[in-house]
């Protein structure tokens, strides 16, 4: 097992799923960046908190949950140094980390508890492959932040 600090954030639709994940990620240090209830909120507020935590080194990896995972993913990917993949299955969780070196995953609250837990475990424990073509491509993506 790799020791990492995990940041987790959700909007109101992802709140219940976030709580389930927190309860099951006891092997890791998990920091919750909100929201704290099912009251309606604006997802960019919580995406930004999670993104800042990664940028500042408070956490190593992030998990974002909203209705579809799309909104959180879009918001997080606007932030420099954040590489968020919207994932729906274990294969995507593995590939986003091993090929793209993603540091955040965004998921839909509609996923089953079992699927979410499998996705998160694979994301956390999959290393970046360091294959030359993936390093080159990831460097090209990083350069886009300067355009």
Predicted features along the sequence, with ranges:
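Short, solvent-exposed amphipathic alpha-helices that sit
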Residues: 13-26
């Amino acid at each position: 097992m790799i020791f990492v600090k995990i940041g987790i954030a959700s909007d109101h639709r992802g709140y219940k799923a976030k709580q389930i994940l927190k309860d099951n990620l006891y092997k890791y240090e998990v920091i919750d960046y909100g929201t704290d209830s099912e009251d309606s909120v604006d997802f960019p507020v919580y995406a930004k908190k999670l993104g800042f935590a990664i940028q500042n080194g408070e956490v190593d990896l992030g998990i974002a949950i909203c209705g579809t995972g799309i909104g959180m993913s879009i918001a997080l990917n606007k932030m420099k140094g954040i590489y968020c993949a919207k994932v729906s299955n274990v294969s995507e969780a593995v590939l986003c980390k091993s090929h793209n070196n993603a540091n955040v995953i965004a998921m839909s609250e509609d996923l089953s508890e079992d699927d979410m837990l499998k996705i998160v475990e694979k994301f956390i424990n999959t290393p970046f492959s360091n294959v030359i073509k993936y390093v080159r491509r990831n460097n090209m993506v990083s350069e886009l932040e300067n355009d």
